[in-house]
Swiss-Prot record:
Required for the formation of a threonylcarbamoyl group on adenosine at position 37 (t(6)A37) in tRNAs that read codons beginning with adenine. Is involved in the transfer of the threonylcarbamoyl moiety of threonylcarbamoyl-AMP (TC-AMP) to the N6 group of A37, together with TsaE and TsaB. TsaD likely plays a direct catalytic role in this reaction. The lineage of its organism: Bacteria, Pseudomonadati, Pseudomonadota, Betaproteobacteria, Burkholderiales. Disulfide bonds: none annotated. It comes from Burkholderia pseudomallei (strain K96243). Keywords: Acyltransferase, Cytoplasm, Iron, Metal-binding, Transferase, tRNA processing. HAMAP family: TsaD. It is found in: Cytoplasm. The gene is tsaD. This is tRNA N6-adenosine threonylcarbamoyltransferase. Its cofactor is Fe(2+).
Amino acid sequence: MLVLGIESSCDETGLALYDTERGLLAHALHSQIAMHREYGGVVPELASRDHIRRALPLLEEVLAASGARRDDIDAIAFTQGPGLAGALLVGASIANALAFAWDKPTIGIHHLEGHLLSPLLVAEPPPFPFVALLVSGGHTQLMRVSDVGVYETLGETLDDAAGEAFDKTAKLLGLGYPGGPEVSRLAEAGTPGAVVLPRPMLHSVDLDFSFSGLKTAVLTQMKKLEAAHAGGAVLERAKADLARGFVDAAVDVLVAKSLAALKATRLKRLVVAGGVGANRQLRAALSAAAQKRGFDVHYPDLALCTDNGAMIALAGALRLARWPSQASRDYAFTVKPRWDLASLAR
């Protein structure tokens, strides 16, 4: 089965072709980072318009790279939610228009399910069941993943997502957009232990997260730094130390909660998905913990940590292989800007 995947939930336009027998044949991605940088964040209207411009050229790119023809495609999967309403509507409209014109069925995919399953795209995918740490700009969750469509929420953030905390910390430090990679790069120049920040809920009995207090602690420290240093190299070094303190605190919490989830479920496999999963400090800490504690940790390829069409094509193919009745030829669709992943549990 050959599935075309279309991702347009936020500021990346992604298309891909996934074959259930041959794997990922091709994927193409356009990021809108440069366009949104001058605004310091994603502008929804601009994002939607750019998806319209980019989708069909990316489709041609994917078809050319894979050697596939439109007649070879068996179904079209698209991100139905969650995400920006306008951006979702663009992707859904294009998917259904193509499906109608080509006489193909469609299937709407939960964006986070795509992230959860994205580590299955590697050469040696982890077998079910596993614990998944889903960590991105909008979500931070720990899930038990028993099979496709069989998900149990173990813990989640009570306020800010980890990626959101990274982005807001970057703004407090006067860094550019996107903030997450910028604050991580600055942290690498900081001195370990020079600034020690709180680890919210590190020792709580549950598996939930909270990052708003950590963000507030960064704000407090930043005000002190600006009052003590008018500027110059001293302030820049202090900001690097503060960035290091923030990243160390966030990573400590993510690692500790992941270990607790593995212990609670008695599983030995951890999958890390979402944009923050590309963070080098987080990967290093989890790999060290895995070696020490004797569990396996799996990540998507770095190129597939961000939003992408490959994960949507994969999720669509896996769902249609298990539940062919989920394919639709109605070509009437809704999008779900807010959509609880737990609602997919079977």
